Design a protein with these regions (language model features):
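Intrinsically disordered, low-complexity proline/glycine-rich segments
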Residues: 1-66
Length: 66
């Protein structure tokens, strides 16, 4: 599994995306709390409660930068 840090315009880490070998992704905030999932096989993005929020990989839209 690969972990990619996400940074804001001040270069602070605001989250992470974990990428599985099959292409599935998990979005986590800076405290490693899960915010959402991308299921590559179904090509859908789900929130932390597994509700579909969109088609395609729109995980970063679930990330809030304060």
């Amino acid at each position: 599994m690969q972990r990619i840090p996400l940074k804001d315009n001040r270069f602070r880490i605001i989250g992470y995306i974990d990428i599985a070998p099959n292409g599935d992704k998990t979005l986590r905030n800076e405290k490693f709390q899960i915010l959402g999932y991308y299921k590559a096989k179904q090509d859908v993005t789900q929130d932390a409660r597994f509700m579909i929020v969109g088609r395609g990989d729109i995980l970063t839209s679930l990330l809030r930068s304060d």
